[in-house]
Regions:
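Residue-level signal for inorganic ion chemistry
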Residues: 21, 25, 220, 277, ...
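Buried hydrophobic packing segments
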Residues: 119-129, 158, 220, 277-281, ...
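Acidic-enriched catalytic cores of C-N bond-cleaving enzymes acting on peptides and small amides
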Residues: 181-190, 195-204, 209-260, 264-324, ...
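Acidic-glycine-rich active-site phosphate/pyrophosphate-binding loop
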Residues: 87-103, 187, 191-193, 247-257, ...
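Acidic/His- and Gly-rich active-site-bordering loop/insert found
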Residues: 1-110, 131-136
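Active-site metal-coordination/substrate-binding segment of hydrolases
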Residues: 77-144, 150, 163-164, 436-437, ...
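Acidic/histidine-rich catalytic neighborhood of metal-dependent amide-processing enzymes
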Residues: 115-195, 225, 229, 233, ...
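An extended, acidic, His-containing surface patch that forms the Zn2+-binding/catalytic region
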Residues: 50, 258-261, 265-334, 344-349, ...
Length: 462
């Protein structure tokens, strides 16, 4: 049987299912009546499980934390780990973010590539094998996570709380081809400062710690407008991402900063609007107060830096490359200012090195610190069975030759398992659109995903 040919018979149906899946706005909200990540995520999970059920597969919903679609027999299990939760859509979309609109051979929408498109491709690859009655030695389980973009409570619930056994072998279609052999560590923390002076200031930037913010704004009182205007004009010279202002009430002026959104793991693909705002404020803001203290901190330790150089964290190793840092959010609520950091650190770097340096900076500027999460790096030998098998499948299906496994700054579910790596679903020649405005799935690439994943499931499950 020519599996790559057979699976393409499902292409049209799979694309329609993806369009419908994108329409389910699955951004995390607070817990509600048996929906730990909010009702929207629950509805999306039910949609994906229902697809599996209609295909005649066994489906299980584990209390709306995580879903499972399974087929086949066998003592051992091949696991496929995907997720259907998405990051907030942000602003400035050309196409509606939750409509699944198809334009010029691309289906647009939040989650189209991260990660609903790849999940659908894997599901229809499973359906193809099932419909053809192809006998596999392992059973195949597609796990559908609902909290990948935040705290991984879905995975913790499945493996830690429910104590489910790990699959003997697994992959996650939530990164980039050809195959990922190492993933950097992910360390997220907040710096917090409290002062009654903050009650008079509105400050807001960013929507997610792991996204590069594209807007940030601050409202200040009793500002000299002509001085502000000339400072902005001077600052904006030869800059692509600019600062703007407007008067919003008598004596109150709002200052806006532009940036470019990107995934926080690839900060170099974006331009950070929060850092841009504070670079400007350093030149303009003169009052001696707690806000000035925060501006000075940005100037000394952050500027527009994304490599942690200013913070004294610069580090590089051969396996995984440079450390990177993203300031994902900043907010003032009542008397509390909070800055959210996302550090991606190389596999050979020790977390205690990072903590020692950050603690020094924290003390210098009298911040409190809250650790949000740490995920240890992942490293698999390039010649391991899993990495080398996936590499050869990729070469066979695409016809590319001499490709090498790569390292990833992003974090995938792979690091939650003993024998799992990320495999796709973005092709190397494709720009990353995850977490960005006008995220899409290219429909020609989608066909290639069907072909790659049907071969992958067939080979790994035998």
């Amino acid at each position: 049987v020519n599996l790559q040919k057979e699976v393409l018979f499902y292409n049209e149906e799979a694309v329609n299912s993806l369009v419908e899946g994108i329409k389910k706005k699955s951004v995390k909200k607070s817990e509600k009546d048996g929906a730990p990540f909010g009702n929207d995520v629950k509805v999306a999970l039910e949609y994906f499980l229902d697809l599996g059920k209609k295909m005649g597969m066994k489906t299980t919903n584990y209390d709306n934390y995580i879903g499972e679609i399974e087929f086949g027999e066998g003592e051992e299990t091949l696991g496929i780990l995907g997720h259907i939760d998405v990051v907030p859509e942000g602003n400035n979309w050309t196409h509606p973010p939750f409509a699944g609109k198809i334009v010029d051979g691309k289906v647009y929408g939040r989650g189209a590539s991260d990660n609903k498109g790849p999940v659908i491709a894997c599901l229809y690859a499973m359906k193809c094998l099932k419909d053809l009655n192809i006998k596999l030695k392992k059973k195949v389980k597609l796990l559908i996570g609902c909290d990948e973009e935040n705290d991984w409570e879905c995975i913790k619930y499945y493996f830690d709380f429910l104590n489910k056994p790990q699959p003997e072998i697994a992959f996650t279609p939530d990164a980039i081809f050809p195959v990922i052999f190492s993933e950097k560590g992910i360390f997220q923390f907040d710096f917090i400062k409290r002062s009654d002076e903050f009650r008079d200031i509105y400050l807001d930037g960013g929507v997610a710690t792991n996204s590069v913010p594209d807007t940030a704004n601050i409202v200040l009182k009793n500002i000299n407008e002509s001085k502000l205007k000339s400072s902005i004009e001077k600052y904006n010279e030869n800059k692509e991402y600019k600062i703007y202002y407007k008067e919003i009430a008598e004596g109150k002026i709002e200052i806006f900063s532009q940036g470019k959104a990107a995934h926080g793991a690839m900060a170099e693909m974006g331009y950070n609007s929060i850092q841009n705002l504070f670079c400007f404020l350093k030149q303009f803001y003169t009052a001696q107060n707690e806000m000035k203290n925060v501006i000075d901190f940005f100037d000394k330790y952050l500027k527009m830096d994304i490599e942690g150089k200013e913070l004294g964290l610069k580090f590089v190793d051969e396996e995984s490359g440079d450390l990177s840092i993203n300031i994902g959010k900043i907010h003032i609520i009542d008397n509390e200012l909070r800055i959210s950091f996302d550090v991606r650190y190389p596999v050979k770097m020790k977390l205690k090195t990072i903590l020692a340096q950050i603690n020094k900076v924290k003390k210098e500027y009298a911040f409190e610190m809250e650790i949000i999460k740490n995920q240890m790096p992942l490293y698999k030998e390039k010649d391991s069975y899993l990495v080398s098998t996936l590499l050869s499948i990729y070469e066979d299906v695409t016809g590319e030759r001499g490709v090498q496994p790569i390292s990833l700054s992003g974090g995938t579910y792979a690091r939650a398992l003993n024998n799992c790596v990320a495999f796709g679903a973005r092709f190397k020649n494709q720009k990353s659109v995850a977490h960005q405005v006008d995220e899409f799935m290219d429909l020609e690439n989608f066909k290639m995903l069907l072909k790659i994943y049907v071969e992958t499931i067939y080979k790994l499950a035998n």
